[in-house]
Amino acid sequence: MYLLDTNIVSMLDQRRHAHAPELIAWMKRNGGSLCLSVMTITEMDAGVLKLRREGKPDRADQIAGLVTAILTDFADRVLAVDLETARHVARLGELTHRQAVELPDLVIAATAARHGLILLTRNMSGFSRLGVPARDPFVDLPTDV
C-alpha cells in the first residue's frame, strides 16, 4: 500500500490531469490501496485560505471542491496522527535537525513509517534522508496492486 504526498494528491486537480495521465489512470485503478496523511488535508486547506487571502476566490473554490472530493474518496484512508506517529515525528526531527526538514514532511514521513506504507512523492531528495521507503511515480510508476 502507498501513502500519497501532497504533491501527488495535487495531480488530482482537473487542471493538472494533462501533466500526469498515466499516474491519474494508475491512481484510479489502485484507489483502494492509496492512503493520505491528515497533513495533506492541512496543506491543501492552507492553500485554499492563502488563495482567498490573495484575492483568488475562484481558484480557492476549485481547490476546496477538490479537498471535499478527496475526503469523500479517501474517507476511511485518511490517516490521523496518533501518539506513535507523533513520537516518530519527534525522532525524525531529531535525526534531521541540521537539515531543516519542514514539519509537514516529517508528519507525512512518520505516517508512512507508522503504517508500513511506501510514500509516493515528487520530493525524493526531501524524503530520502528520512529513511522512509519512497518512490517518484513520475520516474517509476508502481505496478498495479
PLM feature spans:
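Residues that scaffold the ATP/ADP-binding catalytic core of kinase and kinase-like folds
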Residues: 11-12, 47, 88-89, 130, ...
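Acidic-residue sensor for enzyme active/binding pockets
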Residues: 43
